[in-house]
């Protein structure tokens, strides 16, 4: 009888859990159908090697996230709670979290939705040159110079940050971005049932990637300074790339290997071939993370503001993007953050 009751209770909890993330699931489902339809129309297989790589990286990092959260909660207990019996309090807190059926179920559904979205997004990104061949780079390069007094932004930036050590540090922050993005998504998913700010972050993040990483990236198809010469636009950014290669002989510049891998994948139809510059999704997603951080704590928000500034610098410093890519991305993120709030209120 007890087992039967548990099963019925579990089933009754599934409906409310799905309902809490209905906006997120709806957006992901619409995006999935849109990309799948595009694949059918273009005769392109619905699959991407990038998606499997991203999911594999996430699987490896989940145990680390759990350890980080355990240490964070323990530190919170020591600094803020200060119970008379720390061990008993911590054990009880952990037990309550693990037995919170609504929280766990809602988190699982949200997390699965985000994983599905990662897959369909990367497929959509691979479709960009099939729908709209890359052509906007000369325009964006010209706009960059026009906005910065006739000089390429990377030249201005390198007057301040143009050393091998600083470039390595910025590159490290740029690579840390993926782990941080995964971590915040994981945290938000398993806190959705506790506060709307977590739900808002997930919805805003999906909107940002769909509108920016798929729709705008297709409309303004571009490859970025790093591939400017390879795609036949001229040697304008050869000095930038030569400088980075020179730096790499003194201090690591890991971006160069990834850039070569993506170009090789694009030219030879490899598993990793998602090239796209406008807008910068590194910048857009980091600004969204920053807005989320501010909704949790002003201190977290200012820390993330500094990180967002590093990502914006890195997008130009490492040759991935034109400065204008980042500027548009900031505006995009702010708009998606506001739109997420409206959507959640509309379907409240």
Summary of predicted features, one role per range:
Residues 260-348:
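Membrane-embedded catalytic cores of phosphoryl/pyrophosphoryl-handling enzymes
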Residues 107-111, 186-220, 226-240:
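Interfacial segments of alpha-helical transmembrane regions
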Residues 36-49:
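Juxtamembrane "helix-exit" motif on the non-cytosolic side of transmembrane helices
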């Amino acid at each position: 009888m007890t087992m039967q009751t548990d099963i019925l209770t579990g089933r009754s909890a599934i409906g409310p859990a799905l309902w809490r993330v209905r906006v997120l699931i709806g957006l992901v489902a619409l995006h999935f159908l849109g990309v799948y339809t595009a694949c059918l129309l273009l005769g392109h297989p619905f699959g991407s090697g990038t998606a499997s790589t991203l999911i594999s990286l996430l699987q490896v990092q989940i145990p680390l996230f759990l350890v980080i959260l355990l240490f964070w909660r323990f530190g919170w207990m020591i600094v803020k709670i200060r119970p008379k019996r720390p061990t008993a309090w911590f054990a009880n807190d952990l037990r309550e979290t693990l037995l919170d059926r609504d929280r766990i179920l809602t988190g699982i559904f949200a997390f699965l939705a985000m994983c599905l979205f990662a897959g369909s997004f990367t497929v959509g990104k691979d479709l960009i040159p099939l729908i709209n061949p890359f052509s906007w780079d000369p325009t964006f390069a010209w706009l960059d110079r026009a906005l910065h007094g006739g000089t390429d932004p990377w030249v201005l930036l390198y007057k301040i940050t143009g050393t091998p050590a600083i470039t390595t540090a910025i590159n490290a922050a740029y690579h840390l971005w993926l782990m941080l993005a995964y971590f915040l998504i994981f945290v938000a998913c398993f806190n959705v049932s506790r506060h709307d700010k977590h739900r808002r972050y997930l919805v805003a993040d999906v909107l940002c990637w769909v509108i920016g990483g798929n729709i705008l990236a297709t409309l303004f198809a571009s490859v970025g300074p790093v591939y400017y010469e390879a795609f036949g636009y001229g040697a304008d950014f050869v000095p930038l790339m030569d400088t980075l290669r020179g730096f790499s002989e003194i201090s690591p510049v890991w971006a160069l290997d990834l850039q070569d891998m993506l170009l090789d994948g694009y030219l030879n139809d490899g598993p990793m071939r998602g090239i796209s510059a406008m807008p910068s999704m590194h910048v857009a997603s980091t600004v969204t993370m920053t807005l989320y951080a501010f909704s949790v704590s002003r201190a977290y928000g200012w820390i993330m503001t500094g990180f967002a500034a590093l990502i914006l610098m890195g997008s130009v410093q490492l040759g991935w993007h034109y400065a204008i890519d980042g500027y548009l991305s900031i505006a995009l993120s702010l708009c998606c953050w506001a739109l997420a709030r409206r959507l959640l209120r509309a379907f409240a």
